[in-house]
């Protein structure tokens, strides 16, 4: 085994400014958090029913809902993950924006007109009408797993950034700090609990109306934070966008091919594009967080405006965060960071391993090279873990060491904003699913409006405890994993079958409940297996292909089962295909959209 290569980067750790949060930074952060809590309290006083708590009375402004859709799906995952990916692949990572025009056609033209005619609170009510309660409950359970994983990754990334920036050293005080891990376990445990519980406390107060309006403010804060980051770098270095892009193009990044038949190839233009396409259409067609936003506006026209606003915001922030990534890459040339030094050393060591492998292939033949590659595999995995963690830590360490006070506090507030916009949305949606898909249909007696509203708030608080525990486990499981990869492994493995289930319900007149349950379960097995293919099979699988692979498995299995299971949907269930829904003039009335069967009386197949 080769020793780590010596980096060409000199030992400059002694000149890295100490940094950390100043009193002025803390004042900015506290004022921001107090404002969010105050808004939640103010809106909570006006809520009288679960319709207000879950849907805002279906009367929220379309533009605000659009910003909320985007802000909820952005989170610290993208806010920190995209700059980290820019270090890894350079401007090639912008190919993730390529499928957005095609996604616009699907969501604008197919999904929104359909869902807005159904008068839903939970998206999974539709599956009860089209299939039966078993399919509805199964999909709702896996959406809850998706949301738990999603919120947990958000809390984890926010906590990691805060530990990097604040330099708490709680572990040193308790005697449990392990300097070799990079992350301090005691620090992370405390911050995970604090971030998660504060966000859930704020969310239990104001419901979806508070979520939407605080998302608007949080969107503005995170935009200002990103723009100020680039502005400060431009001012401090006397550089501009042209300098940053030129430097990025001249830097050797991980190569991104256009296409590859190797499913273990992490990123190609094709896999990034196809992965983002399926992620978008499945999220906007099956994820309660996105669909619940559309249900808060009055009609199809306003829902389309909401989606258009979110799509434009996605394109805009994608470019801005790419700008943050390339500007940081330019800045750290002359401004050292622990993370950038670790990145350079890991990159140099990986290059040395590549050179050794290539020399063996040229001098001793392919068989000798394969033997050396097998010997190098463990060392390569460790180096890539170090590299991944270093790339995701550059932005937080830059904030800590080089940003001036007040501006540093504003950017930290933006990190909180990105986390809170996802946490509040996810918590409200989990409470919606538990109330609408489980408590209502399974309860023997109907709760009063006041009782159901109180229960919704209790459920939201309980979800906070679950999320904190889930996040603590995920933290120890995922050390050394890149944030973008962590998204796929932590929760996106559940998304593909959810999207396929809704699409089969909409477009197939033959797929029935038994086909759907079996196909859904197999699709989820494939999604989880693909996410953890290295652990299960000892071979990598591209994280960008996890959602498409699970989606395709579910679709093909359901259609294939038509040949062996003769069950067919009933006439009542066929009323809920997309064509029938759009043609049914009676669906304009909410009463006409109520399900005809519950869990105790399954719809006839």
Descriptions of predicted regions:
Residues 2-605:
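Membrane-embedded helix-loop-helix hairpins and adjacent transmembrane boundary segments
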């Amino acid at each position: 085994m080769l020793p780590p290569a010596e980096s060409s980067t000199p030992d400059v750790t002694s000149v890295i400014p100490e940094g950390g949060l100043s009193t002025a930074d803390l004042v900015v952060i506290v004022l921001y958090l107090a404002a969010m809590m105050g808004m939640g309290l103010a809106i909570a006083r006006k809520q009288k029913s679960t319709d207000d708590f879950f849907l805002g009375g279906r009367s929220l402004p379309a533009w605000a809902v659009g910003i909320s859709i985007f802000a909820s799906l952005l989170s610290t995952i993208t806010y920190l993950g995209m700059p980290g990916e820019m270090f890894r692949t350079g401007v090639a990572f912008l190919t993730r924006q390529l499928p957005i025009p095609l996604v616009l056609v699907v969501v604008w033209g197919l999904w929104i007109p359909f869902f807005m005619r159904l008068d839903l609170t939970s998206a999974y009510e539709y599956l009860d009408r089209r299939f039966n309660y078993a399919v509805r409950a199964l999909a709702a359970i896996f959406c809850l797993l998706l949301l738990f994983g999603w919120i947990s990754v958000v809390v984890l990334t926010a906590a990691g950034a805060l530990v990097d920036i604040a330099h708490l050293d709680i572990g040193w005080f308790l005697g449990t700090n392990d300097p070799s891990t990079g992350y301090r376990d005691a620090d992370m445990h405390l911050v995970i609990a604090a971030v998660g519980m504060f966000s859930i406390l704020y969310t239990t107060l104001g419901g979806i109306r508070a979520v939407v309006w605080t998302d608007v403010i949080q969107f503005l804060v995170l935009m200002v934070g990103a723009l100020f980051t680039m502005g400060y770098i431009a001012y401090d270095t006397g550089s501009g966008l042209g300098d940053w892009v030129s430097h990025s193009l001249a830097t050797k990044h991980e190569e991104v091919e256009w296409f590859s038949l190797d499913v273990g190839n992490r990123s190609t233009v094709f896999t990034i594009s196809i992965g983002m396409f399926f992620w978008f259409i499945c999220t906007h067609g099956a994820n309660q967080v996105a669909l619940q936003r559309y249900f808060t506006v009055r009609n199809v026209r306003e829902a389309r405006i909401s989606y258009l606003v979110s799509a434009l915001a996605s394109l805009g922030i994608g470019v801005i965060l790419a700008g943050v990534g390339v500007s940081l890459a330019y800045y750290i040339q002359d401004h050292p960071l622990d993370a950038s030094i670790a990145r350079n050393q890991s990159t140099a060591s990986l290059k040395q391993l590549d050179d050794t492998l290539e020399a063996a292939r040229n001098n001793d033949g392919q068989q000798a090279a394969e033997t050396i590659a097998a010997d190098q595999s463990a060392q390569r995995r460790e180096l890539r873990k170090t590299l991944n963690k270093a790339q995701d830590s550059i932005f937080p360490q830059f904030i800590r060491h080089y940003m001036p006070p007040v501006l540093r506090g504003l950017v930290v507030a933006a990190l909180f904003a990105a986390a809170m916009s996802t946490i509040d949305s996810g918590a409200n949606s989990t409470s919606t699913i538990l109330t609408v898909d489980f408590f209502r249909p399974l309860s023997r007696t109907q709760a009063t409006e006041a009782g159901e509203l109180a229960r919704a708030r209790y459920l939201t608080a309980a979800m906070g405890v679950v999320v904190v525990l889930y996040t603590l486990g995920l933290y120890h499981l995922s050390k050394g994993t890149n944030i973008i990869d962590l998204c796929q492994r932590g929760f996106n493995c559940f998304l593909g079958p959810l999207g396929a289930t809704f699409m089969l319900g909409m477009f197939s007149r033959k797929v029935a409940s038994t086909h759907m349950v079996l196909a859904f379960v197999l699709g989820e097995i494939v999604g989880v297996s693909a996410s953890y293919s290295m652990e299960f099979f000892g071979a990598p699988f591209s994280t960008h292909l996890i959602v498409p692979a699970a989606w395709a498995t579910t679709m093909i299995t359901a259609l294939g089962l038509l040949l062996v299971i003769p069950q067919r949907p009933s006439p009542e269930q066929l009323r809920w295909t997309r064509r029938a829904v759009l043609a049914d003039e009676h669906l304009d009335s909410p009463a006409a959209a109520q399900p005809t069967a519950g869990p105790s009386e399954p719809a006839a197949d």
